[in-house]
């Protein structure tokens, strides 16, 4: 069995947190509340994936649903920062791609639980 850190879904989430940390470093201080919130949401995604990996059945599905909700919030905040001109197009494109991939991975994992009847 893989450890949590070895899961591809966890590694994708960790890469997103790394990129968001770089973005937070480069934005003006007046956006500190927004960037802090985005970093907390990204950390929460990592935590919910780790917790989901420890559970089975409905509990696992619950934590994966929380991860999906946090991913959606991150997508929205990244869009706001892009529209305000605080994220370069290349970085936003990479983040959007990783967030889409992460959402697909988490949704597939959650849906596999439902199809197994757990």
Language-model segments: which ranges?
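Amphipathic alpha-helical assembly/interaction segments
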Residues: 1-118
């Amino acid at each position: 069995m893989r450890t949590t850190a070895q899961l591809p879904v966890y590694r994708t989430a960790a890469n997103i947190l790394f990129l968001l940390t770089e973005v937070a470093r480069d934005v003006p201080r007046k956006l500190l509340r927004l960037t802090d919130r985005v970093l907390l949401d990204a950390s929460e995604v990592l935590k919910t994936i780790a917790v989901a990996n420890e559970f089975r059945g409905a509990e696992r599905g619950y934590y994966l649903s929380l991860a999906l909700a946090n991913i959606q919030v991150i997508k929205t905040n990244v869009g706001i920062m892009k529209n305000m001109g605080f994220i370069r197009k290349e970085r936003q494109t990479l983040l959007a791609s990783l967030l889409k991939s992460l959402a697909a991975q988490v949704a597939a994992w959650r849906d596999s639980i439902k199809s197994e009847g757990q």
